[in-house]
Amino acid sequence: MKVVSSIGSLKKRSKDCQVVKRRGRIYLICKSDPRLKVRQGRAKMKRK
């Protein structure tokens, strides 16, 4: 899975791609071609 700063242009890669929001992050998933998986948003730092 790749991490990108913007998935706006990547939405149109395939007709099966869909944008999903999970736990504050935005994911682009594709059932027909799993190589196209993308995540937007970086990991948050945990407080000690």
From Swiss-Prot:
One of its GO terms (cellular component) is ribonucleoprotein complex. It comes from the Eukaryota. GO terms for molecular function: structural constituent of ribosome. Its main location: plastid. The keyword Ribonucleoprotein applies. It is found in: Plastid, Chloroplast. Keywords: Chloroplast, Plastid, Ribonucleoprotein, Ribosomal protein. SUPFAM superfamilies: Ribosomal protein L36. PANTHER family: 50S RIBOSOMAL PROTEIN L36 2, LARGE RIBOSOMAL SUBUNIT PROTEIN BL36B. This is Large ribosomal subunit protein bL36c. It comes from Emiliania huxleyi. The gene is rpl36.
